Amino acid sequence: MSAGSTPKPSPLVEGIFRREILPWGLLGLTLGLVEGATAAILVKQHFAGAASSFGVNIAVALVSGAPAFSNVLSFVWANVAHGRARVQLMVALQAAFALLVGCVALASRASAGLAVTVLSIIAARVVWAGILTVRAAVWTANYPRHVLARITGRIVIVNAIAVATSAALVGGALQGRVIDARWLYGGGAIAGLSGAWLYRAMRVRREFQLLAAEAAHGGKSEPFSLRMLTQILKEDPAYREYMLWMGVFGAGNLMLTAQLVLLFSEQLHLTSGVQIGLLAVVPLLTQPLFMPAWSRLFDGSHVVRYRSRQGWALVLASLTLCLGVFTRSLTLLWLGAVLLGAAQAGANLGWNLGHNDFASLGRAQHYMGVHVTLTGLRGGVAPPLGVLAYMGLERWHAGSGEWALLLPLAMTVAGALGFNRMRVALER
C-alpha cells in the first residue's frame, strides 16, 4: 500500500458486511414508519379533529422526540447485552421491534387510537435503542477503526434509502387517501421480521475476546446503571464535556423538527406529501451523497475535530429552514431540506461511532450507553418544550409562533461553538 493511500477493507470484513446489509435494509423499511418527522406528520394529519388540538400537538412532540427519548433506558439494554452473545439477542430485539411497529395498524382514528399509536411508536423506539446499543459493540468488534466509518457508512446509506422509501409511501398515502396509511405499518412489520430472520446468519469476530474484555470490566457483577453513567462522566472529563455540547447541540435539532411539523401544517398549510418530502424523504435521500465525504473525514480525525466541522453544517441547514419559514419561501425550504440531509449524514456517523474515540476495549458499549441515555433525556424534554414555546407564542399573538424557531437555532449555534472550543483545547 502506497504512502497516503486509503486502506481497503479485508475480504473477511467485506464478507461480514455482505451478511448484514440486506437485514438492515429490510429493517430500514420498518424503521422509516416510526422515524420522528414521518410519525409526527402521520399523527398531525391522521388524528386532526379526532382529539383536542392540544393533545394532538403534544402527541406530535412525543413521537417527534421518540427516536431520542427512547434511548433514556439504554443503560438497561447495555446491562442485558453485557456478557451475552450478540447475534441471538439482536434477532430477538429486531423481531420485537417489527411487531410493535405493526401495532400502529390496529389503532382506531379516535383519542384511544391516538394513545395506542403514540405508545406503540415509543415502545418500538425503546426496542430500537436496544438494537443500536448492541449493534455498536458488534460493529466495533467486526470492523477495524481505519475502515469502521466507511463500512458502517455503507450500511447507513442503505438504511437511509429504505427509511426514505417508507416515508414517501406514508406521505403518498396521507395525501392521496387511496389507502389508510396505517396499513403500511402491517407491511413494515413483515419487512422487519424478514430482516430479523436473515440476521441469524450474522457472526461476531473474536466474540470470546469481547466477552472476556467485558468480564474484565466487571461483567455481570457490575451492570451498567445510572451510577456507572455518573462514574464515567466523573472520571472522564473530556467525554463529559463532549456530552455537554452534544446535549445542547442535539436538543436544538430535536426541538426544530417538532416545531416545523406544526408550522408546516398550521401556518404554511403545506400538503402531507410536501411536509414529509421536506422533513424526511429529501434529507434521507441526500444523506448517501454526502456520507462518503463525512466517512473519510471521520476516519482521518478524532471525533472532536470531526464535530467541530460537522456542527456548522447543521447550523447552516437550520438557518436556511428558519429563513424559509419566515419568508414563506418553498425554494429556501427545499434547499434547507437538502442541507439538512447533508448535515444529518455527518451527524448520524458521529452519533453512532464517536464514543469509540473515548472508550477503551470492553467499555465501548458502556460509553455508548451513556451517550444514548443522555440523548434520551433531551429527546424527552426538547420537543415538548419547543412545542409549548410555539403554542405559548401563538396564544399570546396569533401568527407569532414562528419566532419560537429562534430557540433551537440558538442552541445549535451554541453546540457548534462548544465543539470548536474542545477542538482548540485538543490541539494545544
Descriptions of predicted regions:
Residues 2-17, 206-244:
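Juxtamembrane intracellular "pre-TM" segments in multi-pass secondary transporters
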Residues 130-143, 346-360:
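Intracellular juxtamembrane helix-capping segments at the cytosolic ends
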Residues 82-95, 299-314:
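Cytoplasmic membrane-interface "Motif A"-like loop-to-helix N-cap segments
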Residues 2-72, 238-280:
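Helix-loop boundary and gating motifs at the non-cytosolic
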Residues 172-190, 390-412:
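A membrane-interface helix-boundary motif in multi-pass transporters
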Residues 72-86, 174, 289-303, 390:
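Helix-to-loop junctions at the C-terminal end of transmembrane segments
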Residues 95-112, 313-328:
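C-terminal ends and interior cores of transmembrane alpha-helices
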Residues 10, 23, 105-108, 191-203, ...:
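Multi-pass alpha-helical transporter architecture, strongest
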